[in-house]
Amino acid sequence: GFLDIINKLGKTFAGHMLDKIKCTIGTCPPSP
């Protein structure tokens, strides 16, 4: 449903933010 889409977008956005934070700290995996 619509909420499922919102949840997926939220998780994806949160995941991207976490990746950016990890990269800032220097612990992100190398980009493909």
Curated annotation (Swiss-Prot):
Superkingdom of origin: Eukaryota
UniProt KW Disulfide bond keyword: yes
Covalent S-S links between cysteines: 23-28
Keyword Kinase annotated: no
Residues that span the membrane, as ranges: none
Subcellular location: Secreted
Tissue specificity: Expressed by the skin glands.
Major site of localization recorded for this protein: secreted
Keyword entries, A-Z: Amphibian defense peptide, Antibiotic, Antimicrobial, Disulfide bond, Secreted
GO biological process annotation, one example: defense response to bacterium
GO CC annotations, alphabetized: extracellular region
Similarity-based family: Belongs to the frog skin active peptide (FSAP) family. Ranatuerin subfamily.
Role played: Antibacterial activity against Gram-positive bacterium S.aureus (MIC=60 uM). Shows no detectable hemolytic activity towards human erythrocytes.
Protein name: Ranatuerin-3
Species the sequence originates in: Aquarana catesbeiana
Biological classification of the source: Eukaryota, Metazoa, Chordata, Craniata, Vertebrata
